[in-house]
């Protein structure tokens, strides 16, 4: 079996441009377990990059400064300089006034999930009857949520590195965290205790709702861009869509043959990508529950029985680029792949040993990927100028579900294009 179909020559696939890597400091104890980078994240405004570098530690790095350091290291490679290795101390010396600071945060337990949240003051708390709150989040507030091995969630102030809240209700590992993108500071946590919990940080972190329905571990969750729908995925081939206004299950998506471990919506909310241990990434229409595209990582495509068991092509993570046209995936075959939604073969590939997670930068220009040794690797995302047709499609689909597209008085071919049926 191979990583690419017979019609594709691996040597002809583009090579992703490697930018740099971050290496954690050497731990004071020799333990291989607990040093994994299970998650990486970029702040919504692009100001910070965060990753769990293992052994309870989360590192917050100013992204522009980090990116600039990669350029410097590239120039120094001729002199034999290695990758950037971070010290255990915060590099706060020689900072200009107002310049973002690096922070090293000891979370007290192994970190599995990370998420940035930013506040919009005019977005009211869902608990409208409560007039007094301990925390008054301003317009420039930026928070970091960390999900821990002991089931706790800790909320940190990104600018100061100080602990603000400690959320306790899960009874097992908090595997993933996601903030609503509307600035409401509504946080959803996915746990191995088979539940999703909804927290309102503007109401001092009170829990709003428990979403039940998964019969096994919940691996990941993701909000739609308008915050109205939540996708959650987990063990047992589960892909659930939830109405976040009523906190009810909308539908289940069926098509995977193994555990589903990652999910993400496209920027216009018209597409949903899910990654599974069955060697595939499936791109869905979340409005109609139909499969639009399958991105295979093992060829010939395995049978459902083989895909449902142990194989060496487990897809660990998937991420949508902010241009709405590119997807990245991390797999156990030691490759990171960059896909275009217009093609069924990778546009570019890069080497990555023991990759676990990936995320695009806010502007979509860089992909970061974490690995089992606590390091993070960065590649330049393959970019091209989007057609005006695609930009118009994204603009329209941000406000129009698939069902409404097919009521428009336009040719059927244009309806199919707007509905992404031409993928």
UniProtKB/Swiss-Prot annotation:
Keywords: Repeat, Ubl conjugation pathway, WD repeat. Transmembrane segments: none annotated. Residues 373-423 form the SOCS box domain. One of its GO terms (biological process) is protein polyubiquitination. Pathway: Protein modification; protein ubiquitination. SUPFAM superfamilies: Nitrous oxide reductase, N-terminal domain, SOCS box-like, WD40 repeat-like. It comes from the Eukaryota. The keyword Transmembrane does not apply. InterPro entries: G-protein_beta_WD-40_rep, N2O_reductase_N, SOCS_box, SOCS_box-like_dom_sf, WD40/YVTN_repeat-like_dom_sf, WD40_repeat_CS, WD40_repeat_dom_sf, WD40_rpt. Residues 76-100 are annotated as: Disordered. WD repeats lie at residues 125-166, 169-209, 213-252, 255-294, 310-347. Component of a probable ECS E3 ubiquitin-protein ligase complex that contains the Elongin BC complex. The SOCS box domain mediates the interaction with the Elongin BC complex, an adapter module in different E3 ubiquitin ligase complexes. Probable substrate-recognition component of a SCF-like ECS (Elongin-Cullin-SOCS-box protein) E3 ubiquitin-protein ligase complex which mediates the ubiquitination and subsequent proteasomal degradation of target proteins. This is WD repeat and SOCS box-containing protein 1. It comes from Danio rerio (Zebrafish). The lineage of its organism: Eukaryota, Metazoa, Chordata, Craniata, Vertebrata. The gene is wsb1.
